[in-house]
């Protein structure tokens, strides 16, 4: 109902929407927010749809002052802001950014969202209608405003991470997180450098057991048992969930600098709900100087959002010695 969407958008400063798949239910909301200069935050992890929205609405958003911020949940706040946090520390200590960062999921306890599974299914369906989306999904720089950077380190099969001395497996959220990280870099004038490389994988442990686990994870469908959209875990399960993501910056002298981002609730529900709420509040209350446009979390809110997440959302951002 486009009329009711228009009325809603005209009556608020910021629309916070959790209604996905966004490629099915988001286009009119983004269109109306952009047209009326209303801010917008979502949980989108659908790069094909985001690519379309950027192409269709970015120019007008700059004109109307609408700040559209995609991916304000577990995809991709811990990863986007984790890289941003670490690069700021590297630049402060070494005078230039790290040209390579490895994202490594150390722990992730909790159920995946039924909406995440539905979004993936919708993306697969849209590929049949729009085969040109294959190129978007395969390109790590698909959201980087036409910029094409260096070839990225492969992350699609189990490998041994020699610097961490552990086997790592493909991480099913990497295809969206990596695109968002590269978009952030582009939006910030390539703060991380034009030669920046970034990949994400899931730590499984050392030795033969670690290898077997990594190969198993690489062969499975992590969303096979996800709940239906609108369904989810119990409060106890949400409260007992957590996650821990390590970021490893490889420096020119051969050393590394590590940062960790942790969350105190399950990633798909408990933590994500707090992240998107804090994003909306931050955007409206603390980012009045941010120009209109289509953003990722880091260039939109950066340090301001990190501070809010640590104060009110149960996240931590720390450098590890």
Predicted stretch roles:
Residues 63, 76, 88-321:
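C-terminal catalytic/substrate-binding lobe primarily of soluble NAD(P)-dependent oxidoreductases
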Residues 47-49, 73-80, 111:
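Gly/Ser/Thr-rich loops at beta-strand to alpha-helix junctions
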Residues 1-14, 18-24:
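Conserved Rossmann-fold cofactor-binding substructure of NAD(P)-dependent oxidoreductases
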Residues 21, 30-50:
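ADP-ribose/adenylate-binding Rossmann-like module
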Residues 29-33, 57, 61, 309-310:
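A generic structural signal for well-ordered alpha-helical segments
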Residues 44-66:
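Rossmann-fold NAD(P)-binding glycine/threonine-rich loop
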């Amino acid at each position: 109902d486009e009329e009711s969407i228009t009325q809603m958008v005209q009556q608020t400063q910021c629309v916070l929407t959790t209604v996905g798949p966004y490629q099915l239910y988001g286009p009119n909301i983004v269109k109306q927010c952009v047209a009326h200069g209303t801010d917008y935050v979502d949980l989108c992890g659908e790069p094909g749809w985001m690519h379309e929205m950027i192409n269709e609405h970015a120019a007008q958003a700059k004109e109307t002052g609408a700040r559209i911020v995609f991916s304000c949940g577990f995809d991709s706040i811990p990863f986007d802001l984790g890289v941003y946090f670490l690069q700021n520390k590297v630049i402060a200590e070494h005078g230039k950014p790290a040209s390579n960062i490895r994202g490594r999921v150390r722990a992730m306890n909790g159920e995946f969202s039924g909406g995440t599974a539905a979004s993936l299914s919708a993306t697969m369906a849209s590929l049949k209608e729009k085969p040109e989306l294959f190129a978007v999904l395969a390109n790590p720089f698909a959201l980087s405003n036409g910029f094409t950077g260096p070839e990225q380190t492969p992350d699609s099969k189990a490998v041994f991470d020699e610097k961490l001395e552990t086997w790592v497996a493909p991480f099913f959220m990497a295809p969206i997180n990596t695109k968002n990280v590269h978009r952030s870099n582009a939006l910030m004038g390539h703060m991380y450098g034009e030669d920046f490389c970034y990949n994400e994988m899931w730590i499984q442990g050392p030795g033969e057991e670690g290898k077997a686990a990594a190969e198993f994870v690489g062969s499975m469908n992590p969303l096979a048992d996800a709940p239906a959209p609108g369904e989810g875990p119990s409060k106890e399960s949400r409260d007992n969930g957590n996650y821990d993501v390590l970021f490893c910056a490889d420096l020119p002298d051969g050393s590394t600098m590590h940062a960790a981002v942790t969350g105190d609730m399950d990633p798909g529900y408990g933590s994500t709900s707090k992240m998107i709420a804090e994003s909306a509040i931050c955007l409206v209350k603390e980012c009045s100087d941010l120009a209109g446009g289509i953003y990722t979390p880091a260039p939109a809110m950066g340090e301001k959002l990190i501070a809010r997440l640590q104060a009110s959302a149960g996240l931590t951002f720390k450098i590890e010695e």
